[in-house]
Structures are given as structure tokens and as C-alpha cells.
From Swiss-Prot:
GO terms for cellular component: extracellular region. InterPro entries: Self-incomp_S1 (IPR010264). It comes from Arabidopsis thaliana. GO terms for biological process: rejection of self pollen. Disulfide bonds: none annotated. Pfam families: Self-incomp_S1 (PF05938). Glycans are attached at N88. Belongs to the plant self-incompatibility (S1) protein family. This is S-protein homolog 20. Residues 1-26 form the signal peptide. It is found in: Secreted. The gene is SPH20. The keyword NAD does not apply. It comes from the Eukaryota. Its main location: secreted.
Length: 135
């Protein structure tokens, strides 16, 4: 076997390992559940989308849930963001980020409590996040 053939074999094997390793990760399905914890008697409007999928506007009464299910993409860059509105507030948050949520939310629903101070992920150890900067 000459050097060129060995190089092509090594390159092919490396590519296959990368390809199949990535495919194993790509099958991760995440269920996102959003809860209106803004406060008593406060309706929460929300609108979630990704760069290519619009989930439409929703309206949640206090303590009401709404959610969606998403298979993470091959490259691990899935991103869904939501716009939240209540009373005189308008906030944005990246509700599903593959790199942040894959491990925590792969086996259990990714439950988000939406609070005035920011969204808190209840899955696993509770962790609160700041709202996205307003553009």
C-alpha cells in the first residue's frame, strides 16, 4: 500500500467516526415546558421560534403550562428563542440552546418557570438565568 492510499484510508476512517459520532448525538429529543410564574392574575403572552420554525403566539394564565418538542439538529446548534409579554414588560430569552440544555434535558422535560426576574430551569438543579439583552 502506498502512502497516498494509507492517507485516504485514515481520512475515510476519521470522517466515518466524526459522522457516526455526530449522528448519535443528533437523535436527542428535548421536550420544553413553559410555566407562567409571573404572578397571580397576570396573563403571560409568549411567542417562540427558531430561525426556520415559528411556533406561533400563545397566552398563558397564571400557573398554566405550554410546551413543544424538538429533535436537536446534527450540528448541535439548535436554538429556540421566545418573546414574553406581560403588563408593561417585554422580554426575550433563548429557551432551548442545544449546548446548554442537551445534557440536562435529554431524559426529562426541560421545565422553565417564567418569572419577572428571569426564566428559571427547574429540570435538574434549579438554575435561573437573566433575560436576554434588548436589541
Amino acid at each position: 500500500m502506498n502512502g497516498s492510499s494509507a492517507f485516504h484510508i485514515i481520512l475515510s476512517v476519521t470522517f466515518m467516526v466524526f459522522l457516526f459520532g455526530g449522528l448519535c448525538e443528533a437523535g436527542v429529543v428535548v421536550n420544553v415546558d413553559i410555566i407562567n410564574d409571573i404572578g397571580p392574575n397576570v396573563q403571560l403572552g409568549l411567542h417562540c421560534k427558531s430561525k426556520d420554525k415559528d411556533l406561533g403566539p400563545q397566552s398563558l394564565a397564571p400557573q398554566q403550562h405550554w410546551g413543544f418538542r424538538k429533535t436537536l439538529d446534527f450540528w448541535g446548534v439548535t436554538l429556540f428563542f421566545c418573546h414574553f409579554e406581560w403588563e408593561n414588560q417585554s422580554k426575550w430569552f433563548d429557551i432551548l440552546v442545544a449546548g446548554r440544555d442537551r445534557n440536562t434535558c435529554a431524559e426529562h422535560p426541560c421545565v422553565w418557570s417564567i418569572r419577572p426576574s428571569g426564566p428559571c430551569r427547574l429540570t435538574g438543579k434549579e438554575k435561573c438565568f437573566p433575560w436576554n439583552d434588548q436589541y
